[in-house]
Amino acid sequence: MSSQYTAIESDVPQAQPAGATGPMDNQMGGEPNSGQINSDPSSWTWIQRLKQSSHPVALLFYIGFRILPIEIYIFGNFFIGFITKKNRFILHFIVLVLLISGDFWNLKNVAGRLLVGLRWWNEVNFIESSSTGEFENVWVFESADPSRYINPIDSKVFWTLLYGQPVAWIVLGILAVLKFEFLYLILILIAIFLSFTNALAFTKCDKFGKANNLATGFLSRASGTILSRLNPFASR
């Protein structure tokens, strides 16, 4: 298991909107306008929260890919019935497969990298020391520069939906068993497997990146201390 570094552009918090009222305006007796954003984050609407995202387009696609497969699974047959009365199950199944695959790819390659600065992939390497031609499965983790700004809204939405979607699929799987919908159960098992794979991989990637950054910081401080002590011109 190894880790590599990928250069991801630095994110900076968005500037305060021009119409926002600052503390000095309140002291001067200025009245807040109705169109101004409330300075209390706890009272923000979902639209206001999403506007504070560092990558709003990536965040919207991430939310859509996470939620849409579940909604289509629940309500898809109803809406497909308005389009065609034949082969509804086949069309419903194909649409779900495409959405689940798109969600897996988007989360693994786009959303994780932009929203939280993490990415992972799997490699199969040949074991040179093996005489039987064996291969080993290697998980490779990438993390952004520790100095990169991670937007708290992006991070919270990312981790909430990362762990929340597998739970929803498990509940739907239990309902499919109770209804004897075993063909749908196969699709749900695939969705659970892919969701758990991403959840496990990003959890390990996050822990590995934090441990790597901690070790790097410790070594840099230790080497700096040793060099300063060995330097005869260093001030004491």
UniProtKB/Swiss-Prot annotation:
InterPro entries: TVP23-like (IPR008564). The keyword Membrane applies. It is found in: Golgi apparatus membrane. It is a multi-pass membrane protein. GO terms for biological process: protein secretion; vesicle-mediated transport. Keywords: Golgi apparatus, Membrane, Transmembrane, Transmembrane helix. Residues 1-39 are annotated as: Disordered. Its main location: Golgi. Belongs to the TVP23 family. This is Golgi apparatus membrane protein TVP23.
